[in-house]
Structures are given as C-alpha cells and as structure tokens.
Amino acid sequence: KEGYPMGRDGCKISCVINNNFCKVECQAKWRQSDGYCYFWGLSCYCTNLPDDAQVRDSSTNKCGG
C-alpha cells in the first residue's frame, strides 16, 4: 500500500524537495515504510505501507487548512 500520510490536522504533510524529511515522517508512523517528497504535490508520499495504514483519502479528507 502507498499514499499520503496525514499530519495531526488531517492535512497532507508538506515538503519542498526533501526526501529524507519525508522518509523520516513515514517511518515514524510505519517503521518498515519508505517515503519521498512528491514534487508536483509538494507533499510527502509513503510507500511499503501495511494494508491497514491510514493515509489521505480525498473522498473523506477532513483537512483543516
């Protein structure tokens, strides 16, 4: 599974071309995952996630910002 991790506010985690930052963010939530900064979205994107990982779903997004 893969997807955009959410911050405490329910929004995607922003980044500016910093793959290491996103890798740390993804691994803080899911230890065996990987992550990178998705350039076009300027948001962290996680890969190698467990099936039950909660990632952003545009149909149920409750982002405060």
UniProtKB/Swiss-Prot annotation:
Keyword line: Disulfide bond, Ion channel impairing toxin, Neurotoxin, Secreted, Toxin, Voltage-gated sodium channel impairing toxin
Keyword Secreted: yes
Family according to the record: Belongs to the long (4 C-C) scorpion toxin superfamily. Sodium channel inhibitor family. Beta subfamily.
Designated name of the protein: Putative beta-neurotoxin RjAa43
Cysteine-cysteine disulfides: 11-63, 15-37, 22-44, 26-46
Tissues expressing the protein: Expressed by the venom gland.
Location in the cell: Secreted
Organism: Rhopalurus junceus (Caribbean blue scorpion)
CDD domains for this protein: neurotoxins_LC_scorpion (cd23106)
Xref: SMART domains: Knot1
Record GO cellular component, one term: extracellular region
GO molecular function, one term: toxin activity
Entry's free-text remark on domains: Has the structural arrangement of an alpha-helix connected to antiparallel beta-sheets by disulfide bonds (CS-alpha/beta).
Principal location: secreted
InterPro entries xref list: LCN-type_CS_alpha_beta_dom, Scorpion_toxin-like, Scorpion_toxin-like_sf, Scorpion_toxinL, Scorpion_toxinL/defensin
Keyword Disulfide bond: yes
The LCN-type CS-alpha/beta domain, residue ranges: 1-64
